[in-house]
Structure formats: structure tokens, C-alpha cells
Design a protein with these regions (language model features):
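Positively charged n-region of N-terminal signal peptides that target proteins for export
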Residues: 1-4
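Hydrophobic h-region of N-terminal signal peptides that target proteins for export
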Residues: 10-17
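Glycine-rich portal/gate segments that line the openings of hydrophobic small-molecule binding cavities
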Residues: 34, 45, 64, 68, ...
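Short, surface-exposed coil-to-beta transition loops
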Residues: 39-41, 96-102, 123-128
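Short, well-ordered alpha-helical segments
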Residues: 52-61, 160-168, 172
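Hydrophobic pocket/interface hotspot
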Residues: 52-54, 63, 105, 131, ...
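Beta-strand/loop substructures that line and gate deep hydrophobic ligand-binding cavities in soluble
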Residues: 117-163
Length: 188
């Protein structure tokens, strides 16, 4: 029994040391309120080639693995246009917030994509993802304009946008870094 405890502690110490030495992806995020809308800009660099980066941002259904995204499913795909239904659930300072949206993505292989809400709870939601090769890594660059249509007080929404969005992008960057270790078969 004592050997099992010592072995388990050794494994836990090894895991903690490995996690400590894992390079942390730096994520830059800015959120600015402009009138009734929010402008969001974010970027992060991941040790992943451009093909795998594009496969990552176009894996729409994998978005369910990001905290706050309850559902994400492809409704249709035609050429470079993809329609995705997405449901996000958050609690913002004790206010439950659920946002349903249908997005149209226009893919530009290995360069990025544009997206726009075509139906949903937001008054406006549109933006872009751009991929910038940097050596053996790729920089993910996101920009969007969001005007939320909600009963949640505006000050609470502003708090959410400025304090929670960064965590969401950090989770995306961590997921991309994890996926970088298991390349997409389409890119082999």
C-alpha cells in the first residue's frame, strides 16, 4: 500500500512539473464599447502550421468544448459557405444569459473566414478570423462587432464582455495548442 501511495505521488509530481513547463500561449484581447455595440479584437500565436490552424477554426462543432458554448452544429455546407447553429449559456453576475444564433461562415482556405449572424438573439454579430503564418507557428487574429439584445442590464453586459471574453479566447488558444500535438488528417 505504501508503495502505491509513493508511486501515485510520484506520478502527480511528474504531471504538475510537465504542466508547469508547458509553454503558455499569450492571448491579447481588447473590448471597446462603441455606442450600443462592443468591438472585440483578439489574437494568439500557436505552434501549428497554417493548414492545421484553418482546420481548427473551421471545426465548428468542436466549439462545444469551449466553456460557455452549449451547442454548435453545422446546418448546411455549400462550397465555401457554412451555416452553423450555436447556443451559448453564461451566468453574468447572477444573471443567466442564453444566446441562440445562426451564423453564416464564408471560408477562405488557409487564410481565415468571415462570419455574420443571419438569425438569432443578438442585434448584430459579425466578424472575421485571419490566419497569419509566422515561421512554424500561426497567429490567429479575431475581430468582431457584437450588439447584444438582452434583458440583462447594460452595465452587467459590459462587465461580462470586458472580464469573461479573455477567458474564452484563452480557452480557445489552449485548445488550439492541444490540437497542434495531434495534426488534422486533412493536413498530412
Amino acid at each position: 500500500m505504501k508503495q502505491l501511495v509513493v508511486f501515485t505521488l510520484g506520478v502527480l509530481v511528474s504531471i504538475c512539473n510537465a504542466a508547469e513547463h508547458q509553454p503558455k500561449t499569450e492571448v491579447g484581447v481588447s473590448v471597446h464599447k462603441v455606442g450600443e455595440s462592443f468591438e472585440v479584437k483578439a489574437s494568439y500565436l500557436v505552434p501549428m502550421d497554417i493548414c492545421n490552424a484553418f482546420a481548427f477554426i473551421t471545426d465548428y462543432e468542436d466549439a462545444r468544448n469551449i466553456k460557455g458554448i452549449a451547442e454548435s452544429k453545422i446546418i448546411s455546407r455549400t462550397d465555401n459557405k457554412v451555416i452553423v447553429e450555436r447556443k451559448a449559456k453564461e451566468t453574468v453576475l447572477l444573471f443567466p444569459l442564453e444566446i441562440n444564433t445562426t451564423l453564416e461562415y464564408t471560408e477562405m482556405p488557409n487564410r481565415g473566414l468571415n462570419f455574420e449572424q443571419i438569425h438569432g438573439d443578438n442585434k448584430t454579430y459579425k466578424g472575421t478570423w485571419r490566419l497569419e503564418p509566422q515561421g512554424s507557428s500561426t497567429k490567429f487574429v479575431y475581430q468582431s462587432v457584437i450588439e447584444v439584445n438582452s434583458m440583462v442590464p447594460k452595465t452587467v453586459l459590459e462587465y461580462f464582455m470586458k472580464n469573461t471574453i479573455k477567458k474564452r479566447f484563452e480557452a480557445m488558444a489552449a485548445r488550439a495548442t492541444l490540437k497542434a500535438h495531434a495534426p488534422n488528417p486533412k493536413c498530412a
